[in-house]
Amino acid sequence: MNIAYRFRIYPNREQEVLLAKTFGCCRFLYNQMLNDKIREYEATKKMLRNTPAMYKKAYPFLKEVDSLALANVQLHLEKAYKNFFRDPKIGFPKFKSKHRSRKSYTTNVVNGNIQVEDHRIKLPKLKWIRMKKHREIAEKYCLKSVTISMEPSGKYYASLLYEKSDCENQAEEFDYEDAKILGIDYAMHGMAVFSEDIQKENEGYFRKSEERLAREQRKLSHCVKGSNNYYRQKRRVALCHEKIRNQRKDFLHKLSYEMAEAYDVVAVEDIDMKAMSQCMHFGKSVMDNSYGKFRELLEYKLTWRGKKLVRVDRFFPSSKKCCKCGSVKKELKLSDRVYLCTCGNRIDRDLNAAINIREEARRMLLAG
């Protein structure tokens, strides 16, 4: 099992120049290799097996940057092709834009070429860089690779990928009759409703900061493109987006941590978030809630502790089924926010669904 730690780094001016050169070389090599593959296939109907070494003679500037970063470019391109052949809907590999593509590169650990110490990290070609190491890393973890990235705001980060032994946290054998199971139902407002009494509301960070973001974007639209004021204002807009993103991630990490610590099993409905955002006209609410990201974080945190995330089938009638008597309503409108049953049960619609998801997960686990 792999785990990544992301720390902010503070390169000096000389290192910033080399980082910019590495980002550019990786983008250039990716585009060149992709272009040659396309031309070769058009001419011969065969796939070209090109490598970074084939380009260093024609483009000597590639020798100035980390060779492992260039090797990873080849791996990323091959992965893009594999993803396309596996599922054409993903799309054919695209060329990387100089201004719109993400500025990052990955390098690997070879013969101790990367070293991590308190408040600094040593990287190939860059030597020692100051780093804000805000948490300790277990000595038993094995460092595999480091990804260096630059945000639109101008901040630099190092993502350290460690390998963790799979046998450390084996899934525990619970008595599912008595296990602590939490059911979660997606909600348009507040992100989710829980089967237990957990009061944790999403702050809707994007909407709260929307006015400020709109103000900064209006200022940007009035700047002359390419001027110093334009780039200065563009950075302010990027900082607004970054703050919203960090607030959202902080909320999701803290909430998923609490769930993983408190419960043995967490059950969620296996809904298609992408389809919901496109088809139900709830795009902004769905994206602001980040429910899909929340499920992803919850799953790895539970697995980390030897616990389980159970996905209940999306066609299970969690909202239409009464959590008391089990009867299923044939007609239930989306506007009906309170569930009323003939047995006398009166309950919030989303809470009823969360309880049903919890009990369905328990049934699935007991059935094996």
List each model region and its residues.
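Positively charged, helix-rich recognition surfaces that bind polyanionic ligands
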Residues: 139, 152-368
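Gly/serine-rich nucleotide phosphate-binding loop at the start of the catalytic core
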Residues: 1-70
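Hydrophobic (often cysteine-bearing) scaffold residues that line and stabilize catalytic clefts
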Residues: 15, 19, 26, 66-73, ...
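Residues on one face of amphipathic alpha-helical coiled coils
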Residues: 25, 29-32, 36, 76-79, ...
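Acidic carboxylate diad motif detector
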Residues: 50-152
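Stable alpha-helical structural segments in soluble proteins, enriched in small hydrophobic residues
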Residues: 33, 69-87, 351-361, 365
